[in-house]
């Protein structure tokens, strides 16, 4: 089964289970201790700039990509926001099922880590309140149910991309051997926001820089480092246990 089909099945199952953040999840680092995007990252492109022309061209590209039914379906699936949904979808590039039941230490790391890093763009979102492409052009998106809610939520930077990029970086540290697959999947998650019509390309690009810039701040937190060691140990244990099972299955 390919990654697109698995993503669609995953989001359906998570939706049925009413996936949500645990109410008691706390960030490792408070938002005001993270790098301030307003102090170091540029404002969104001016509407008369060459950079904005590129944003428009990418929006047009995104609409052509909707003709690919499989890619469009992936863009819809990647409109997921909860850590539970996202972790299940990242399981394939990670190489192991990620869930509260199967990998509690890894899930704890993701819940707290993503909650921390996704806030890195919140201040910029409120400050710029950039208009989203579908709203600017008065055109439909791939997820109509989200249009009204997001119309009053700033476009720059992309929150979905921030969550996906944060999850990829956390999982890469747990399983470095899967780094290429994880980063590729997170990259496509960002592009899905362009394809779906919710974000400009510069929104997506900004999120990856902001999250990458904030990630080192996690390493100053002792609780994060302890949780990372637990997640790494859990992964190694499960991976080691899976090898004998795979060997036995191959001999049958």
What is each PLM-predicted segment?
Residues 2-8:
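Bacterial N-terminal signal peptides that target proteins for export
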Residues 129-135, 163-164, 204-212, 232-235:
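Short alpha-helical linear motifs
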Residues 12-20:
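Hydrophobic h-region of N-terminal signal peptides that target proteins for export
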Residues 188-219:
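Interfacial helix-loop-helix junctions of multi-pass membrane proteins
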Residues 221-252:
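Acidic, carboxylate-rich catalytic segments that either coordinate divalent cations
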Residues 18-19, 173, 216:
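Residues in and immediately flanking transmembrane alpha helices
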């Amino acid at each position: 089964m390919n990654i697109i089909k698995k993503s669609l099945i995953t989001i359906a199952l998570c939706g049925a289970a009413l996936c949500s953040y645990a109410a008691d999840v706390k960030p490792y680092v408070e938002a005001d201790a993270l790098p301030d995007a307003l102090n170091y990252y540029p404002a969104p492109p001016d509407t008369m700039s060459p950079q904005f022309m590129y944003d428009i061209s990418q929006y047009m590209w995104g609409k052509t990509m909707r003709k690919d039914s499989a890619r469009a379906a992936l863009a819809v699936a990647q409109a997921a926001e909860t850590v539970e949904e996202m972790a299940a979808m990242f399981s394939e590039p990670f190489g192991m099922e990620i869930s509260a039941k199967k990998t509690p230490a890894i899930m704890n790391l993701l819940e707290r880590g993503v909650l921390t890093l996704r806030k890195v763009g919140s201040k910029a979102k409120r400050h710029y309140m950039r208009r989203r492409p579908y709203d600017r052009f008065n055109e439909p998106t791939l997820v109509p149910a989200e249009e009204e809610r997001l119309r009053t939520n700033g476009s720059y930077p992309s929150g979905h991309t921030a969550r996906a990029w944060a999850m990829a970086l956390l999982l890469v540290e747990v399983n470095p051997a899967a780094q290429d697959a994880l980063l590729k999947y997170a990259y496509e998650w960002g592009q899905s926001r362009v394809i779906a019509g919710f974000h400009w390309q510069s929104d997506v690009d900004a999120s990856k820089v902001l999250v990458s810039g904030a990630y080192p701040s996690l390493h100053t937190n002792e609780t994060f480092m302890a949780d990372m060691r637990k997640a790494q140990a859990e992964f190694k244990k499960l991976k080691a246990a899976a090898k004998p099972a795979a060997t036995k299955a191959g001999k049958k």
